[in-house]
């Protein structure tokens, strides 16, 4: 396969809340800076230190529902009263241009993404107990 035809891969990271997904991804990015991390949309309020467009796209319920209803999300879920969604177009663009991308999403979202991109998806799931 020529470099021109190479498709990017999706690395889907899923684990329970607080298991260290974000820390694992940050370490991976330090080791492999060619990876891109997908930025999700959420309706929750920003936490201290989180940056718009880097950590998340912070939107209200109406904006989220508009994106969802227009088919803009590859996957979406509700967790602890907040909505989360992965925009389809940046993921498709990364795959098309041969760039690897990391998605930090829940288990159900991972299943949905693997259905859309079965050949490009690498699924990584862990529990904190497995690491120690």
Segments from the language model and where they lie:
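ATP-dependent small-molecule kinase phosphotransfer cores
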Residues: 42-101, 107-111
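Post-Walker A helix-loop "phosphate-sensing" segment adjacent to the P-loop in P-loop NTPases
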Residues: 29-38
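Post-Walker A alpha-helix
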Residues: 24-25
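Conserved lysine of the Walker
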Residues: 21
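Extreme N-terminal, non-catalytic leader segments
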Residues: 1-10, 33
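Conserved phosphate-donor/acceptor-positioning beta-strand/loop module used by diverse small-molecule
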Residues: 101-106, 116-132
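P-loop (Walker A) phosphate-binding loop of NTP-binding proteins
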Residues: 14-16
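Residue-level preference for the first positions of well-ordered beta-strands
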Residues: 8-12, 100-102
């Amino acid at each position: 396969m020529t470099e021109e035809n190479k498709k990017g891969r999706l690395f889907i990271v899923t684990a329970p809340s607080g298991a260290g997904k974000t820390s694992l991804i940050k370490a991976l990015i330090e080791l492999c800076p060619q990876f891109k991390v997908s930025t999700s949309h959420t309706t929750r309020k920003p936490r201290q230190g989180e940056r718009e467009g880097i950590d998340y796209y912070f939107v209200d319920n109406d904006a989220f529902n508009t994106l969802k209803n227009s088919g803009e999300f590859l996957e979406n879920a509700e967790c602890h009263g907040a909505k989360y969604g992965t925009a389809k177009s940046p993921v498709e663009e990364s795959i098309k241009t041969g760039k690897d991308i990391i998605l930090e999403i829940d288990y159900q979202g991972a299943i949905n993404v693997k259905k859309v991109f079965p050949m490009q998806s690498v699924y990584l799931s862990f529990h904190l107990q497995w690491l120690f």
